[in-house]
């Protein structure tokens, strides 16, 4: 099974036109171990980030009452699914609140400088395009499966018994056995040894 895509949501939630995209990203250390977690908010022109370091993330988890090994990504995914993400912008800073869990989690974000934000926004755009393309392929495959006719299964081996003849066509009905020529009517299955003869009407 493919791993889950990084969660994201649009803000504000609800039927209003979206103005921001909020997503998370896990960072990897050189040894391949998960080294951190960051939240991002963008309006497609500017980018805000939590800019966590391993130490600042550990301090934040301790303040939230979370263990050092606990991943915040599932909490963010659940908040996105429940539309429980709130954003507040203040000049070059932003605050993000995740509710809907045992306790609300609040994060402070700083504006990312343009040269550093550009490659991240490019990666986000390409990643979203790939996800849309993948979803369209799955949808097309599901629609093709739904409209294609289902083939009735056929028996694997040869048919051992022939169907009974149709009584309406003059054939024998079910359970009627054909009599072979010369077969005895008294003892079915035995042929008469004496040839059948006619009646002589000329005898007196």
Curated annotation (Swiss-Prot):
Keywords: Chromosome, Cytoplasm, DNA damage, DNA repair, Nucleus, Phosphoprotein. InterPro entries: PAXX, PAXX_N. The modification Phosphoserine is found at residues 134, 148, 152. It is found in: Nucleus; Chromosome; Cytoplasm. Its main location: nucleus. A motif (XLM) lies at residues 190-204. GO terms for cellular component: cytoplasm; nonhomologous end joining complex; nucleoplasm; nucleus; site of double-strand break. Non-essential DNA repair protein involved in DNA non-homologous end joining (NHEJ); participates in double-strand break (DSB) repair and V(D)J recombination. May act as a scaffold required for accumulation of the Ku heterodimer, composed of XRCC5/Ku80 and XRCC6/Ku70, at double-strand break sites and promote the assembly and/or stability of the NHEJ machinery. Involved in NHEJ by promoting the ligation of blunt-ended DNA ends. Together with NHEJ1/XLF, collaborates with DNA polymerase lambda (POLL) to promote joining of non-cohesive DNA ends. Belongs to the XRCC4-XLF family. PAXX subfamily. This is Protein PAXX. It comes from Homo sapiens (Human). The gene is PAXX.
């Amino acid at each position: 099974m493919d791993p889950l895509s990084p969660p994201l949501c649009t803000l504000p939630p609800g039927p209003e036109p979206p103005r921001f995209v909020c997503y998370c990203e896990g960072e990897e250390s050189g040894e391949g171990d998960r080294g951190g977690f960051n939240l991002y908010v963008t309006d497609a022109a500017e980018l805000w980030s939590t800019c966590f370091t391993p130490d600042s993330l550990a301090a934040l988890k301790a303040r939230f009452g979370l263990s050092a090994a606990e991943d915040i990504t599932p909490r963010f995914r659940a908040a996105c699914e429940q539309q429980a993400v709130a954003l507040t912008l203040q000049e070059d800073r932003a605050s993000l609140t995740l509710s809907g869990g045992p306790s609300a989690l609040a994060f402070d974000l700083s504006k990312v400088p343009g040269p550093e934000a550009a490659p991240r926004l490019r990666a986000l755009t390409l990643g979203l395009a790939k996800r849309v393309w993948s979803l369209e392929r799955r949808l097309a495959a599901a629609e093709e499966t739904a409209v294609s006719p289902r083939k009735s299964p056929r028996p694997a081996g040869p048919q051992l018994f022939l169907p009974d003849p149709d009584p309406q066509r003059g054939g024998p009905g079910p359970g009627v056995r054909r009599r072979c020529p010369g077969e005895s009517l008294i003892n079915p299955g035995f042929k008469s040894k004496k040839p059948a003869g006619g009646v002589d009407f000329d005898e007196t």
